[in-house]
A protein has these predicted regions:
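Well-ordered beta-strand positions in beta-sheet-rich domains
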Residues: 38-40, 82, 203-205, 304, ...
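Extracellular adhesion/glycan-binding regions together with long Ser/Thr-
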Residues: 2-5, 63-76, 131-189
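Surface-exposed interaction patch
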Residues: 21, 30, 72-149
Length: 590
């Protein structure tokens, strides 16, 4: 009887302890809805501090014929965010911290008067009408509108992405406390000629939460240690030898690196640039004849790969690479710039793997890792055919089957007229990737004037960059979400030792990008269209050959159809969530 009593008391004690642990847990809820609904959770427990958040509706400005005219007045949008803290009744005190952000997902407005005359102003006030007048990176201004009224706020006329309003703000109470922040965005009507903003849109929401947001661009930049090349990242400032000089952060180098054990086999390079090279670690054979990785073999012919000193015939490039790693001849994952985009599935499907080219003006630029299939880009527009040759340098899902597209089958090398651009990339891709993911992509002003063969194809990267997108570039641009890589994106993705090479040297492969094939993570192994036209003609554009050099060919014709790897920039507000950046552990974003 005594034993039963003891057991009952013990069970009761365990239950009581469990309840104590549960109710002593700190409770808060992260609010990011921006939909005008309360998102707080209240837990009725004597020993709990409750910390909750609430946000108002999204902010929207859209100028149309009804509201955009002389005398119509300013256009405004208003919302709020609340942080609510209640202390437990045991200690009667509570202290917490929170962050408040304005996330601008769309802003197409521009300056119509001059850069000192703001068109959109941001005002932030607390519940007592006290205004915030200092924010890092923003300028607080006072202007007079068309009706003579004074309008104050931060100039956000062309701003996009994430704006930090409150950074780790402390909130303390001995009972309960609510901090409310009222936010207003105002389009200022000056009764001047502001026609440049007709039809423009602005969309944003407040985000209030306990955790600090790490922007993807900041995460990438944080991988740069100050030493060029650490983590395969290079800061292209004015002192980087042979660099772009545009203050971008770019990944460069090969995914695999030859080890001392690999060199001990007699290899001096991972893969060769032609079939006469005898010091490549991995060789490719087509129909029994030695060729080189990058050689295109008919699907009807036999093929295999050999590793130096190994007679095993490997059937795919990936098999040969994996075996080389297992033998200790290569190290892998040298460039950790993989991103999973278009899905939250785990593991990330090959079709959804993208790679970070770099950070440009606080925006992260991606390119698809594998060649896009017609299931993503469609069989309309500038689609040509499914191509069944075996590309020996491809690592994707199907090296023997690629969806091929013309750059512009209409025959001209004007990007704005290309159906690859208008239909396959900026209609089909955008629709097929899904609304949620498409909204994460920024509208980019692409430089599409291209350059001459001598300025881009037979020049070193630093010179080519200036003519393609730099100070000597054409003023021809095109605004769209999706594009293709620039030629110089490809050049600068190779190891710095390649930055003295040219895109193509007819007489010596050791002096062009064939020589750096194994040291360039952006080398895809197939045909790659770039977005840049050959401005020396009316019907040619630049592409990367399967052998890794850069050429210029016709944008149409049955024999000139190539693979496509879509490229785009993410909104600067895109947040880093997790991932090391390897293929098996790609970066996840929000």
């Amino acid at each position: 009887m005594e034993n039963k009593k003891t057991k009952i008391i013990s069970i009761a004690s365990i239950i009581a302890l469990a309840l104590t642990l549960v109710t002593a847990t700190f409770a808060y809820f992260m609010a990011q809805t921006g939909e005008g609904k309360s998102t707080d959770i209240k837990i009725n427990a004597n020993t709990v501090d409750t910390f909750t958040f609430e946000t108002g509706s999204a902010l929207n400005l859209s100028l149309n014929q009804e509201n955009f005219a002389s005398g119509k007045g300013n256009q405004t949008g208003t919302t709020f965010a609340k942080a609510m803290l209640t202390a437990n009744n045991k200690t009667n005190t509570a202290t917490e911290h929170y962050y408040l952000y304005l996330s601008i997902s769309e802003n197409t407005f521009t300056y119509t008067q001059d850069a000192n005359t703001p068109e959109i102003l941001l005002s932030i006030k607390d519940a007592s009408n006290n205004e915030i007048t200092t924010l890092t990176g923003l300028t607080y201004k006072t202007v007079t509108d068309g009706k003579g009224a004074s309008i104050k706020g931060f100039d956000i006329t062309t701003k996009s992405g994430l704006i930090t309003i409150l950074n780790n703000r402390e909130i303390t109470t001995t009972s309960s406390k609510t901090e409310q922040w009222n936010v207003t965005v105002t389009f200022v009507n000056y009764n001047s000629n502001q026609a440049g903003n007709a039809g423009k849109n602005f969309t944003a929401k407040l985000m209030i939460q306990k955790e600090k947001i790490t922007l993807l661009a900041d995460w990438v930049i944080s991988q740069y240690t100050g030493t060029q090349g650490d983590n395969a990242l290079y800061y292209h400032n004015s002192t980087l030898t042979n660099g772009a000089g545009d203050n971008s952060y770019r990944y460069a180098g090969g995914d695999y690196v030859l080890t001392d054990a690999g060199k001990a086999t007699g290899a001096t390079m991972m893969i060769g640039y032609n079939n006469t090279v005898t010091t490549a670690l991995i060789d490719f054979y087509c129909n029994g004849t030695k060729q080189y990785v990058g050689y295109r073999c008919s699907s009807s012919q036999t093929h295999y790969y050999l590793i130096k000193g190994d007679t095993t015939q490997y059937q795919t490039y990936n098999e040969a690479l994996s075996a080389s790693v297992e033998k200790g001849y290569l190290t892998k994952d040298n460039v950790k710039n993989f991103v999973c985009f278009g899905t939250d599935a785990s593991p990330c499907p090959t079709e959804n793997l993208y790679r970070i080219i770099g950070v440009f003006n606080n925006q992260v630029k991606l390119v698809k890792w594998d060649y896009a299939k017609s299931s993503l880009l469609g069989t309309d527009g500038d689609f040509s055919q499914e191509y069944s040759y075996y590309f020996s340098g491809e690592q994707g899902e199907s090296p023997s089957s690629n969806s091929m597209y013309y750059w512009n089958n209409a025959g001209t090398n004007t990007w704005s007229e290309s159906n690859l651009n208008k239909i396959n990339l900026n209609t089909n891709f955008v629709n097929n990737i899904g609304t949620i993911w498409a909204k994460k992509i920024a509208t980019t002003t692409w430089k599409v004037g291209g350059g001459t063969w001598s300025n881009i194809g037979t020049s070193v990267p630093k010179t080519a960059y200036q003519y393609e997108v730099g100070s000597n570039a054409s003023t021809t641009t095109y605004e769209a979400k999706i594009g293709l890589m620039y030629v110089t994106d490809y050049y600068y993705s190779a190891s710095p030792s390649a930055w003295t090479l040219v895109g193509y040297n007819e007489s010596d492969a050791t002096k062009d990008y064939r020589f750096s094939k194994g040291e360039n993570w952006l080398y895809g192994g197939g045909f790659d269209w770039t977005i840049s036209r050959d401005s020396g003609s009316s019907n040619r554009a630049f592409f990367v050959d399967e052998r890794s050099y850069v050429r210029s060919y016709y944008v149409y014709n049955y024999d000139y159809f190539y693979g496509v790897r879509p490229s785009f920039s993410l909104l600067s507000s895109t947040a880093y969530v997790s991932g090391a950046g390897s293929m098996s552990d790609p970066v996840r974003i929000n």
